[in-house]
Amino acid sequence: MKTSLCNYSEFKIYPARGMKFVRGDSKVFHFINTKVESLFFRKINPRDIRWSMVYRRIYKNTTTDVSAKKKARKTKKVERNIVGASLEVIQQKRAQKPEVKQAAAEQAKREIKEKKKAAAKKAAPKK
């Protein structure tokens, strides 16, 4: 069952109840009864009417639904092991100084070049 809210008092309006008023600028207002409609046309602010939901909300006379706030999901950085290297080894490499890292990288490059040369010699045809 679809219900709407009264534009003035904010009470629920059930189907086949209430009335609609269409203003000149095509804005549609839903009212629950003629009492509310007359207050609206007299431009009486609903904050001043003690039984309206606006008044009750301002002065905390109504029990509001206490809904738990949804916690925003925060991304967490998780350290995971890489196949062939444990977490301790990775952390040790991160803690190394840049000079040590550079030297290790150059050493690895030299080893790769030597392996390529050795493979090229084996693959080279004999004369």
Curated annotation (Swiss-Prot):
Top-rank taxon: Eukaryota
InterPro entries associated with the record: L24e/L24_sf (IPR038630), Ribosomal_eL24 (IPR056366), Ribosomal_eL24-rel_N (IPR000988), Ribosomal_eL24_CS (IPR023442)
Biased composition (Basic residues): 115-127
UniProt KW Protease keyword: no
Any GO MF annotation of the entry: mRNA binding
UniProt GO BP: cytoplasmic translation
GO cellular component: cytosolic large ribosomal subunit
CDD domains in alphabetical order: Ribosomal_L24e_L24
Residue ranges, annotated region (Disordered): 93-127
Keywords assigned by UniProt, alphabetized: Ribonucleoprotein, Ribosomal protein
Annotated SUPFAM superfamilies: Glucocorticoid receptor-like (DNA-binding domain) (SSF57716)
Family: Belongs to the eukaryotic ribosomal protein eL24 family.
Name of the protein this chain belongs to: Large ribosomal subunit protein eL24
Species of provenance: Dictyostelium discoideum
